[in-house]
């Protein structure tokens, strides 16, 4: 069974943030009105929150009180941002954030479809989420397939 994720829009960064949902939750939560994020509170989420869940492939930052820093997605059909205005993930983002100078945008998207959409997204692949913003994460993924090891930053 795939992990349950909560999708929230962060208007300050124009990204969709995927956050793990507790096993006791029901349905597909979308807290507050679209675009609203609950105020960040370090004490709101215990450091071991979600440790009982089986979330294969989530980075080690997934359960921090700030939420996972690598699981940020933009939807090219739903919003306009600096990144998706160019229709492709800039190659500089590969090099700076992921250290993947030899990896093409197509390869990166295919990898994410396999690793993210097929494993994490509850209802399967979501075609409209095609452009990925992976700015700044310095955490390793802890998933099973060996290819995930290249998600350490250079």
Swiss-Prot record:
Signal peptide: none annotated. GO terms for cellular component: host cell mitochondrion; host cell nucleus. A fraction may be phosphorylated in insect cells and HepG2 cells, a human hepatoblastoma cell line. Phosphorylated in vitro by host protein kinase C or mitogen-activated protein kinase. N-acetylated in insect cells. Pfam families: X. Its main location: host cell. Keywords: Activation of host NF-kappa-B by virus, Activator, Apoptosis, Host cytoplasm, Host G2/M cell cycle arrest by virus, Host mitochondrion, Host nucleus, Host-virus interaction, Modulation of host cell cycle by virus, Transcription, Transcription regulation. One of its GO terms (biological process) is DNA-templated transcription. It is found in: Host cytoplasm; Host nucleus; Host mitochondrion. Residues 68-117 are annotated as: Mitochondrial targeting sequence. May form homodimer. May interact with host CEBPA, CFLAR, CREB1, DDB1, E4F1, HBXIP, HSPD1/HSP60, NFKBIA, POLR2E and SMAD4. Interacts with host SMC5-SMC6 complex and induces its degradation. Interacts with host TRPC4AP; leading to prevent ubiquitination of TRPC4AP. Interacts with host PLSCR1; this interaction promotes ubiquitination and degradation of HBx and impairs HBx-mediated cell proliferation. Multifunctional protein that plays a role in silencing host antiviral defenses and promoting viral transcription. Does not seem to be essential for HBV infection. May be directly involved in development of cirrhosis and liver cancer (hepatocellular carcinoma). Most of cytosolic activities involve modulation of cytosolic calcium. The effect on apoptosis is controversial depending on the cell types in which the studies have been conducted. May induce apoptosis by localizing in mitochondria and causing loss of mitochondrial membrane potential. Belongs to the orthohepadnavirus protein X family. This is Protein X. The lineage of its organism: Viruses, Riboviria, Pararnavirae, Artverviricota, Revtraviricetes.
């Amino acid at each position: 069974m795939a992990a349950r994720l909560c999708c929230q829009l962060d208007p300050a960064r124009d990204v969709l943030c995927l956050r793990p949902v507790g096993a006791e939750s029901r349905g597909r939560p979308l807290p507050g009105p679209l675009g609203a994020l609950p105020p960040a509170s370090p004490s709101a989420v215990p450091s071991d929150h979600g440790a009982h869940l089986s979330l294969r492939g989530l980075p080690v930052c997934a359960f921090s009180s700030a939420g996972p820093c690598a699981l940020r997605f933009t939807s090219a059909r739903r919003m306009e941002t600096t990144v998706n205005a160019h229709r492709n993930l800039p190659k500089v983002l590969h090099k700076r954030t992921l250290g993947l100078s030899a990896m093409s945008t197509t390869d990166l998207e295919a990898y994410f479809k396999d690793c993210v959409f097929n494993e994490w997204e509850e209802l399967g692949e979501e075609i409209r989420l095609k452009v990925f913003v992976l700015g700044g994460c310095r955490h390793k993924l802890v998933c099973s397939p060996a290819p995930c090891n290249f998600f350490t930053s250079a």
